[in-house]
């Protein structure tokens, strides 16, 4: 039997998130800016989601985010919030 594929004009949100950024129904980047609260001093720092350098808190000099091959790894204890447009 053929597996039901779903509606091509109205794909589910989950299937759109799994697709490559250029093959989505509406093209959109995977990267974003985010506000990170430092767990030591509660200072808010704006960081790019795919940061390529180590991000350090400006007031207490602790490491907030470390680069990986894709998205930056946020240090445990730090809270983040995605910035809106």
From Swiss-Prot:
Which parts of the sequence are C4-type zinc fingers?
38-60
**Keywords for the protein's UniProt record, in alphabetical order:** Metal-binding, Ribonucleoprotein, Ribosomal protein, Zinc, Zinc-finger
Where would you find the membrane-spanning parts of this chain?
none
NCBIfam families from the xrefs? LSD1
**InterPro entries from the UniProt entry:** Ribosomal_eS27, Ribosomal_eS27_Zn-bd_dom_sf, Ribosomal_zn-bd
The record's cofactor note says: Binds 1 zinc ion per subunit.
Q: Name one GO molecular function term.
A: RNA binding
UniProt-listed GO biological process terms: ribosomal small subunit assembly; translation
Family label? Belongs to the eukaryotic ribosomal protein eS27 family.
- Is Metal-binding one of the keywords? yes
Give cofactor(s), names only. Answer: Zn(2+)
SUPFAM superfamilies, A to Z: Zn-binding ribosomal proteins (SSF57829)
Highest taxon in the source lineage: Eukaryota
Q: What is the protein named? A: Small ribosomal subunit protein eS27
Q: Does the keyword Zinc apply?
A: yes
Q: What is the lineage of its organism?
A: Eukaryota, Amoebozoa, Evosea, Eumycetozoa, Dictyostelia
One GO CC annotation: cytosolic small ribosomal subunit
